[in-house]
A protein has these predicted regions:
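Hydrophobic beta-strand-centered segment that forms part of the acyl-chain substrate-binding groove
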Residues: 98-134
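HotDog/MaoC-like acyl-thioester-processing domains
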Residues: 2-35, 124, 132-169
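A generic structural signal for short beta-strands and their flanking turns/coil linkers
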Residues: 54, 64-66, 111-115, 125-127, ...
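Hot-dog-fold acyl-thioester-processing enzymes
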Residues: 24-25, 46, 71-97
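Catalytic strand-loop segment that frames the active site of acyl-thioester-processing enzymes
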Residues: 50-83
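Hydrophobic alpha-helical segments of small multi-pass membrane proteins
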Residues: 86, 90-94, 114-119, 146-150, ...
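Active-site-proximal helix-loop elements at catalytic-domain edges
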Residues: 34-58
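N-terminal short leaders/motifs
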Residues: 2-22, 66-74, 101-112
Length: 169
């Protein structure tokens, strides 16, 4: 166990020399370890506990993009047996937040301001959650594109989350 911890520490140190973003450092260090992305996703969900209700697992993270999966299970189903749209919105807020933290310039900070979503088809399978950010980071309102897809690739929810971006004090 001690060797595994030392190995992980060395990997993190190597990434910190090339990148300054904590979320990306953790992602790159943990993606190579079996179950590592599940651990990372759960750690992030502990920061904002309501994310634990949908148990998202990050599958891909890079500057400007976060993807995660969300299992269709009884805890997130509605009365007709599909994934409840509010659970999907919760998952979309998760990927948006992770994507923003992995992408935002160090002199800026953000807060979510609003969400607009359209329900475009039934969510009758596990869900893939995606958030995409453009590279234009300016003070003021900014929209992050979000989409949720079924396993067959069919979109079930499309929309955007508006952020309020300000300079750090």
């Amino acid at each position: 166990m001690k060797n595994s911890i030392n190995y992980l520490n060395d990997k993190i140190k190597n990434y910190t020399q090339t990148q300054s973003n904590t979320v990306l450092i953790a992602y790159h260090a943990l993606k190579k370890i079996p179950g590592g992305l599940t651990v990372l996703s759960r750690v992030i969900s502990r920061v904002a506990p309501y994310f634990r209700t949908v148990d998202p697992v990050i599958t891909k993270l890079e500057v400007g993009l976060c993807q995660a999966s969300m299992a269709k299970c009884r805890a997130v189903e509605n009365h007709i047996g599909t994934v409840h749209v509010i659970a999907i919105c919760n998952g979309l807020e998760f990927v948006m937040g992770v994507a923003v933290e992995a992408s935002i310039p160090s002199h800026l900070r953000w807060l979510p301001k609003g969400m607009h979503v359209d329900y475009v088809s039934k969510a009758n399978s596990d869900i893939q959650l995606i958030a995409k950010i453009n590279d234009d980071w300016n003070v003021g309102d900014m929209q992050v594109e979000v989409i949720a897809k079924r396993n067959d690739g069919q979109p079930v929810v499309k929309g955007y989350i508006t952020l309020w971006v300000t300079e750090k004090k």
